[in-house]
A protein has these predicted regions:
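Short beta-strand-to-loop acidic/aromatic patch adjacent to the donor-nucleotide binding site
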Residues: 64-75
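Polar low-complexity intrinsically disordered regions
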Residues: 11-12, 45, 73, 82-87
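Local beta-strand N-terminus motif with an aromatic residue
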Residues: 7, 64, 92-93
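Residue-level marker for beta-strand->alpha-helix junctions and adjacent short loops that shape enzyme
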Residues: 14-16, 74, 101-103
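Active-site nucleotide-sugar/metal-binding loop of Leloir-type enzymes
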Residues: 53-66
Length: 162
């Protein structure tokens, strides 16, 4: 990512956020303020996909180059922000995801944490359970809990939907 590019951090929440999330945003703001554009936030409940669409619409009203969608119960250390920004490229890698885990029922007493990175398979998208830590690699799909997207991708999606 070009050093002059600005990143807007966007999140959806019901009116409150996790303390760890808030603290990680404070740390980012204190140490990387020159990289950050305006924060975008959608407050409310309901269908999360609709909230994320409203978030994208709000982001596209800013002048920022990148949107970093964050789940409001996640934490983003400054070092992880730096890795995402370093890996991103507006043409070669316009979408970069940080690794986030979700919990799924497995029939065991406790939910199984599953990485929200996926490979396409005949039976559908399957979670990738084996990956090199601290590396950048291509996936077929990723969750939106920590997703960095270049403006051009979102503009193209908007324009093609109209």
């Amino acid at each position: 990512m070009k050093s002059a590019h600005k990143v807007s951090i966007g999140s959806c929440d019901p009116g409150t956020v996790d303390g760890g999330f808030a603290f990680s945003l404070i740390q980012l703001t204190q140490s990387r303020s020159s990289r950050l554009g305006p924060f975008v936030r959608i407050k409310g409940s309901g269908l999360l996909s609709k909230q994320r669409n409203r978030l994208v619409k709000q982001f596209l009203e800013t002048k920022s180059d990148w949107l970093l969608m964050m789940d409001s119960d996640e934490q983003l250390p400054v070092s992880s922000f730096d890795k995402l920004v370093e890996a991103a490229h507006e043409k070669e890698r316009p979408i970069v995801a940080g690794l986030v885990f979700a919990s799924f029922e497995t029939g065991f007493p406790y939910p199984q944490p599953v990485p929200t990175i996926f490979q396409d398979a005949p039976e559908g998208f399957l979670p990738l359970n084996k990956y090199d830590k601290d590396s950048v690699f291509e996936v077929d799909a990723a969750g939106t809990g920590c997703l960095l997207i270049h403006r051009s991708v979102l503009e193209k999606m908007r324009d093609e939907a109209d």
